């Protein structure tokens, strides 16, 4: 099977307001963002395997550990049985630097969710989607 190729665009915060802390330890924020023509490329295909395979390659892939947003997303989707036991090979070609404030990791997870929704891998209401993304 051929890879599906998607782009995961970087975002720039035009306005950012920190409004306290959440129980998770993360900050509660309100932000106005704009997307720019700078992106990671993500290759996705179904595999016949027991587990998902996730690979990060490219100049900004060094140091990405197993506790990344793509792995977290797939773990949550598996736990909720939203992927119907289907496994995927996902290759992320990192062009967006880590921890640069450009949203690389979270934007990657978001692009994968958008891809799965467009391919009707699962259906999800806006409310359920909001709850899902809070866990990543």
Please annotate each region the language model reported.
Residues 102-129:
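DPxDG-like acidic metal-binding loop motif
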Residues 62-63:
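Start-of-domain marker
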């Amino acid at each position: 099977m051929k890879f599906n190729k998607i782009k995961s665009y970087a975002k720039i915060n035009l306005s950012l307001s920190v409004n306290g802390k959440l129980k998770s330890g993360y900050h509660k924020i309100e932000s106005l963002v704009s997307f720019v023509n700078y992106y990671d490329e993500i290759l996705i295909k179904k595999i016949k395997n027991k587990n998902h395979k996730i690979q990060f390659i490219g100049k900004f892939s060094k140091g990405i550990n197993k506790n990344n947003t793509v792995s977290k997303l797939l773990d949550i989707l598996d736990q909720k049985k939203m992927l119907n036991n289907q496994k995927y090979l996902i290759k992320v070609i990192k062009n967006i630097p880590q921890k640069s404030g450009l949203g690389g990791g979270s934007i990657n997870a978001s692009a994968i969710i958008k891809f799965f929704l467009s391919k009707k891998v699962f259906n999800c209401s806006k409310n359920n989607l909001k709850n899902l993304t809070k866990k990543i």
